[in-house]
Amino acid sequence: MISAPNCLEMMNNKGFLMSDDKRANSMRGRVLICAGSDSGGGAGVQADIKTVTALGAFAATAITAVTAQNTKGVFGVFDIPIAFIRQQITVVLEDIGADVIKTGMLHKAEVIMTVAEALEEQGNKISLVVDPVMVAKGGHSLLQTNAIDALKSELICKADVLTPNIPEAEVLTGTQITTVDDMRRAGELLLNMGPKAVLIKGGHLSEDILTDILLSQSGEKTYSSPRLETVHTHGTGCSLASAIAAGIAQGQKIDTATERARKYVFDAISTAPGLGEGHGPLNHAHPLVKE
């Protein structure tokens, strides 16, 4: 009998044993996710882990808060102690490491500062994707008002990619966004805050064609796709940002990672399982399930 721990082999998806080399090549890139837990599994770290894994990267986590929620809303939030958030980040970086840190729900200034301090200790050498989560799909606030300035001064200015939706961009810039041109102007204001790139998402505009704009110092790229008329969109922002983070961790350029991420999320929405009575989750596993 062959001992698996000794021969260091594992089964691939066709049932064949894989060598060390093949196993190493099957998963590339490490993403440390600093975000809140969604008990319903549609958003937060649950969506992040599923997304990163489905795209072939490795996901580690530092849980910032635990929420009681389902497709109908958020019913409770339990804050994780700051010292324990920091401990989660520290032990992961000391052992596993990370190519990218992706942030989600950082609900108060102290949490934002904790993540920023961890980045500084690493010499700001780890790429950073900031999803400025402010409000849950059901309307529950996930970011204290007094934390917005900390988000701008401590993380947005250090981000490789910032991924706000329209309401988040309005809060961050103090502007009103009702058109694609407004999106572009807000994106430029956000870019002036220091991130290398800003992906401003146009899903909240009432247009049949959904438009996202990626702005960076080297230029602008516009992405368009047909709007999918569905309520099963819970966790789209988390999933998109994590998909971008996975791509960057795997060595992709930001525009390439963004293009793959948008396709991944579009397909995840279009094949959503239809769970729950409210805003249902996506099908994060669609790249892995072949009929």
Annotate each predicted stretch with a short phrase:
Residues 21-33, 53-138:
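Conserved N-terminal subdomain of the carbohydrate kinase-like
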Residues 23, 28, 79, 255-291:
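Charged C-terminal helix
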Residues 34-40, 221-234:
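Short pre-catalytic strand/loop immediately N-terminal to key active-site residues, enriched for Gly-Thr
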Residues 51, 170-171, 230-254:
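Short, small-residue alpha-helix embedded
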Residues 55-60, 221, 247-261:
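Phosphate-handling active-site elements
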Residues 145-220:
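Conserved phosphate/ATP/ADP-binding segment of small-molecule kinases
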